[in-house]
């Protein structure tokens, strides 16, 4: 979890499902105490600590009983018994996934031992890049920091481009209905989507000037460094199909003779980049905003 609005909501669902039996039994009490598990188990333990001894011990016993029939949880602090459900920002995608991969796909268990781990990420598209690097490492082994290539990034982020989950355009829908994106100047509805109560609904936007600038930066970086540049864009995602059209258009504004510039879907781009990294070759990644966040942690941590 790293996205201020959307991820804590998903995180709260995970906590409630993992501790389902305890919530079924003590849900009313938790509501009375004002527990909000979107803030993690730390919030729950804090509130439970205020209960009379007998009641507190019963609740804690029921919470701990949930661990008996469940998979072990990756630990943030084995000595203190702090699991990754303690707080939504203890284990975050951009920092924790690379560390886990660098550790051979392992994280710490309750006894302070490294064990194989299953990572569960709250989205589907960019999770695949991590699957790709995990598969690659299973086949090729760990990267060697002495010989591996580097992957500088040019991110699409000007003018709040593709802001994600941490801004004022992400909502938890309160009732069933329709979400519209409306042009305030004309009243025209640009996009409509059916939504249900509890949905997380996000709008993202990119301004034309930001795309133009992004293409220029990528071309300049390629020319100055001599590295190939890969635009990580998937023609099957409607938003990115629009970006691809604009990228191709704005590439014509530059002298790209002799430059190696390609557009690939995220998984292909990751595979292509890793094939070069392992041979000590450098590759520029030109990506949207979320991948800028992920990749600028992933490759430096590996290196």
Q: Where are these predicted regions, by residue range?
A:
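Extended, well-ordered protein cores
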Residues: 1-13, 21-246, 250-303
């Amino acid at each position: 979890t790293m996205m201020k609005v959307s991820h804590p909501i998903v995180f709260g669902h995970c906590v409630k499902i993992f501790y389902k039996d305890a919530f079924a039994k003590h849900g009313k009490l938790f509501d009375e105490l004002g527990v909000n598990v979107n803030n993690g188990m730390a919030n729950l333990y804090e509130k439970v600590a205020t209960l009379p001894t007998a009641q507190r011990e019963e609740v804690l016993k029921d919470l701990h009983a949930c661990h008996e029939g469940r998979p072990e949880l990756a630990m943030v602090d084995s000595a203190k018994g702090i699991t990754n459900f303690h707080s939504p920002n203890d284990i975050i995608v951009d920092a924790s996934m690379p560390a886990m991969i660098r550790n051979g796909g392992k994280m710490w268990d309750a006894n302070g031992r490294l064990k194989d781990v299953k990572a569960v990420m709250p989205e589907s598209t960019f999770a695949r890049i991590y699957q790709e690097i995990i598969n690659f490492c299973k086949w090729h082994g760990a990267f060697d920091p002495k010989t591996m290539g580097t992957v500088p990034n040019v991110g699409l982020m000007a003018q709040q481009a593709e802001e994600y989950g941490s801004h004022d355009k992400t909502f938890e829908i309160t009732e069933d209905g329709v979400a519209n994106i409306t042009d305030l100047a004309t009243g025209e509805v640009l996009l409509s989507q059916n939504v249900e109560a509890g949905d997380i609904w996000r709008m993202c936007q990119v301004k034309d000037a930001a795309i133009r600038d992004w293409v220029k930066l990528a071309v300049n970086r390629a020319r100055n460094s001599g590295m190939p540049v890969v635009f990580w864009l998937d023609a099957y995602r409607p938003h990115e199909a629009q970006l691809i059209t604009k990228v191709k258009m704005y590439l014509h504004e530059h002298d790209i003779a002799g430059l190696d510039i390609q557009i690939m879907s995220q998984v292909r781009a990751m595979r292509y980049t890793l094939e070069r990294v392992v041979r000590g070759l450098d590759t520029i990644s030109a990506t949207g905003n979320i991948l800028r966040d992920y990749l600028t942690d992933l490759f430096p941590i590996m290196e």
